[in-house]
Curated annotation (Swiss-Prot):
Domain of life: Eukaryota
Gene name of the encoded protein: MCPH1
UniProt protein name: Microcephalin
Bias (Polar residues): 433-445, 565-583
Modified residues (Phosphothreonine): 334
Organism, scientific name: Colobus guereza (Mantled guereza)
UniProt-listed PANTHER family: MICROCEPHALIN (PTHR14625:SF3)
Length: 841
């Protein structure tokens, strides 16, 4: 530090750049402090010196009014170099804006970043309030938990009892208190977010409420009568979102995969519960209480395993068993709360390699993609049935696993060969067993005669109308139906994707084409080799392909593999069937048979559930399907097959190039091209370019290349007027012929040429050599010369004209011309006089 030569000086520094955007006060403040002066951040009465440069007019006026010494930055520098207090009158400050009118007050804005001050409760009032609010909330929670909290409990006989005292282990709150204490000590600016609490619960399981023990008897937890289907969560007690709670449960369960039962480490404890509630009595005595405890959101939109809302369509795509997921992670217990009454659901792990699945129908929850007005009733009733513990329903040889859960489903190993037999044994919920829709589609358990009678009972009146999702068996409660064995032992399976209630007939037609008949109709085929499908109205616009959303995950691959083969066979076989309809009418019923039996390789058979061969049959209930639909169906499918193979539509052959255009206009052009179609955007002019759009009439390389190739050189207004008209309008009135006279001439020559267009501008000129140091680049300049009919040599000794600066030995017989000669000649569409473009020798 220098000697305190300015110890009596109290300075106020205001030094700005001349344009008022940069504040340089800090540099001079440091120098003044080093010399012993005091620097004030505000202009107060103690200030004796003002270091001023291009500052505020108000500061200047205030300094003059108070008689404070106004000095320039040179005074500070002179004091520093001289090491003494220099006379202030030698370096007076200047105010350049003093005599200018101050009508427009320019706002000063410093572009330098501000110093970052770390927020603590001491220097930030908002953080202090938040800190105090958290502390008060913690104190209130501790007070309410330490006191006597009366609660209502269900006794084993189903009656309500009043428990005067219940104390819950407050490990969660002690963790919060510990966190606040750490914040007080360290003065951290972090609040305990949910992610931190989740991490804390993973590190120390005893500090998480989800692992806080609640004394429900081990017999209730491990018995076969334990319930699994009430999708409530700990949100009412814990305060966490469903997502955080599910993540915490998942983390806890993965750590305990080695143990046979992870329930024992996750038992929630209460001090004064004398007997475990009987879930059978809850089902019998108080079903209304269970209904009231299930929220509407929970009924209609159940959560999946990571806490997000699962819509019915998403459940269809991912609708395989919960057991698959929970077997994988060794069964994390499912927690439920019904107004203070806590339930823990658990299932014992099966000892066998294959999972044992419940084969009675009432345990399988229906899929919610059936009728929407029944969605609430259908989603509640199976959950109530899950609470039943009657002994007559327990027919399990070993430790039985509970039924599937619609809300917490996964399809991790649904296609595993171990699960094929288990999926065959799955039955359907009793609600869906209606007279018009036979519920069981197991072809092995029904004779051919029985299947024929069931088929005759089926109602085909809905064919051709606006289709609803069929009530039959809730589409076997799976997106992919279980493989059905036929009489001859040949395995057949079908995709049963479901369309929404509002799907129109054309959309369903296309779905039927691409997904091998996704709309299952009621009844089984009399031949017993698959299911019956409906082919809807084939009058479908061809541009409808992009409206379909494929299924998720593994189902997407299966759908594409089966759907593509199905569409190909459907077109060909339908045509054959239509041509031979007269011959076959005496032997068979008149029907449009579309056989989708496709040979698969051994590897594909394994991937597609042991061989995906489906039979799609259509009953002749609509004569428009019979009369002329086969040929139109074939024509309809062809473009979709091509789109399926290529993955996207065919690109336009014409390209459009933009030049001298700001990004805002470029974005508008791109949007208009996307809307009106017919063009693709290219960065540079190429063989396919037909239009060059110029935002300003500047001679750019793209404009010159567009002229040389005979393209339209248009103004930006052409795009705007085309957008106004809704289609591409005529280009003549928007051509930039005034600025580029050669453009319309070359364009007409291009239109009149039979083959690929090549100009004749430089056809009569001798061989040229383009210098490597030329500007524009050599490649572009050579391309321009070549497009205009000129000949370009790679070596200078063969050329009679050298374009661009040339540093080698010059010959008297060779013309050394500037690059502008080529550019001006192309622009004017005539060879300019070379004398005006000669380079100095």
């Amino acid at each position: 530090m220098a000697a305190p030569i300015l110890k009596d000086v109290v300075a106020y520094v205001e030094v700005w750049s001349s344009n008022g955007t940069e504040n340089y006060s800090k540099t001079f403040t440091t120098q003044l402090v080093d010399m012993g002066a005091k620097v004030s951040k505000t202009f107060n009465k103690q200030v004796t010196h003002v270091i001023f440069k291009d500052g505020y007019q108000s500061t200047w006026d205030k300094a003059q009014k108070r008689g404070v010494k106004l000095v320039s930055v040179l005074w500070v520098e002179k004091c520093r170099t001289a090491g003494a207090h220099i006379d202030e009158s030698l370096f007076p400050a200047a105010n350049t804006n003093e005599h200018l009118p101050s009508l427009i007050k320019k706002k000063r804005k410093c572009m330098q970043p501000k110093d970052f001050n770390f927020k603590t409760p001491e220097n930030d009032k908002r953080f202090q309030k938040k800190f105090e609010k958290m502390a008060n909330e913690l104190q209130r929670q501790k007070t309410s938990l330490d006191g006597d909290v009366p609660i209502l409990l269900f006794e084993s006989n189903g009656s309500l009892t009043y428990s005067p005292i219940i104390k819950i282990n407050s490990s969660h709150h002690s963790a919060m208190e510990k966190r606040l204490q750490e914040m007080k000590e360290k003065r951290e600016n972090l609040s305990p977010t949910s992610s931190q609490m989740i991490q804390q619960s993973h590190d120390n399981p005893s500090n998480s409420l989800c692992e806080a023990p609640l004394n429900i008897s081990h017999d209730t937890l491990c018995s076969d009568e334990s319930i699994a289907g009430l999708h409530s969560s700990f949100d009412d007690l814990c305060g966490y979102s469903g997502c955080g709670n599910q993540e915490r449960k998942l983390g806890g369960s993965i750590n305990d995969t080695k143990s046979a039962m992870c329930v024992s480490s996750l038992v929630l404890k209460t001090n004064h519960i004398h007997s475990s509630p009987s879930f059978a009595h809850l089902d019998k005595s108080s079903p209304q209480k269970f209904l009231s405890n299930l929220s509407k959101e929970e009924i209609n939109l159940p959560r999946n395993i990571v806490g997000k809302i699962v819509t019915p369509d998403q459940k269809q795509a991912a609708g395989t068993s919960q057991e698959t997921f929970e077997e994988k992670y060794r069964l994390s217990p499912t927690f439920s709360s019904t107004k203070g009454h806590l339930l823990i659901h658990s299932r014992p792990r099966s000892s066998s390699v294959k999972r044992k699945r419940v084969s009675y129908g009432f345990h399988s929850p229906p899929k919610e993609k059936c009728k929407r007005k029944r969605s609430i009733r259908r989603s509640i009733m199976p959950r109530l049935q899950l609470c039943s513990s009657e002994g007559s329903r327990q027919h399990m040889a070993g430790p039985a696993l509970e039924a599937l859960s619609c809300a917490e489903s996964s399809y991790d190993d649904y296609f595993s060969p171990d699960n094929l037999k288990e999926r065959n044994s799955e039955n359907l919920p009793p609600e869906s067993q209606l007279p018009s829709s036979p519920a069981q589609f197991s072809c092995r358990s029904l004779s051919k005669k029985e299947r024929t009678s069931m088929f005759e009972m089926s109602d085909f009146s809905c064919i051709g109308k606006k289709t609803r999702t069929v009530d039959m068996t809730s589409f076997t409660a799976k997106t992919i139906s279980s493989p059905q064995k036929t009489a001859n032992g040949e395995g057949r399976a079908t995709l049963s994707g479901v369309t929404s209630e509002e799907s129109s007939a054309p959309e369903e037609t296309l779905r039927c084409c691409r997904q091998a008949g996704p709309q299952q109709k009621e009844g089984a085929c009399p031949e017993g080799n698959g299911f019956s499908y409906t082919i809807e109205d084939p009058a479908l616009p061809k541009g409808h392909d992009g409206d379909l959303t494929p299924l998720e995950g593994i189902l997407e691959e299966v759908k594409e593999a089966v759907g593509l083969k199905s569409t190909q066979d459907k077109g060909t076989t339908s045509k054959i069937s239509n041509s031979s309809e007269g011959e076959a009418s005496s032997e068979h019923e008149p029907r449009s048979v579309v056989d989708c039996n496709v040979e698969r390789s051994a590897e594909e058979k394994e991937n597609l559930l042991g061989g995906y061969s489906g039979s799609v049959k259509n009953r002749p209930t609509r004569h428009d399907v019979l009369d002329g639909s086969c040929d139109s169906f074939k024509d309809l499918i062809k473009p979709h097959e091509e789109l399926k193979k290529s993955g996207k539509g065919k690109k336009p052959t014409r390209t459009l190039v933009m030049t001298s255009m700001p990004s805002e206009k470029q974005n508008i052009v791109i949007q208009v091209v996307d809307k009106l179609k017919g063009f693709s955007i290219a960065p540079d002019v190429c063989e396919t370019t037909t239009h060059v759009l110029s935002g300003k009439p500047l001679r750019t390389l793209n404009v010159l290349l567009g002229i040389a190739r005979g393209c339209w050189v248009l103004s930006y207004d052409w795009v705007l007027w085309s957008l106004e008209s809704g289609h591409w309008i005529s280009e003549e009135s928007f051509e930039l012929s005034n600025h580029f006279p050669a453009a319309p001439l070359c364009r007409r020559e291009c239109h009149l040429s039979a083959g690929p267009y090549r100009g004749t501008l430089f056809a009569d000129q001798p061989v040229m050599f383009v210098s490597p140091a030329s500007s524009p680049p050599v490649a572009k300049l050579c391309e321009l010369v070549h497009l205009c009919g000129g000949r370009v040599s790679q070596v200078p000794r063969q050329a009679s004209i050298v374009i661009g600066p040339y540093s080698g030995k010059k010959k008297a017989t060779v013309k050394y011309l500037s690059e502008k000669w080529v550019l001006d000649s192309i622009t004017q569409h005539k060879v300019c006089a070379s004398e005006n473009y000669l380079l100095p020798q």
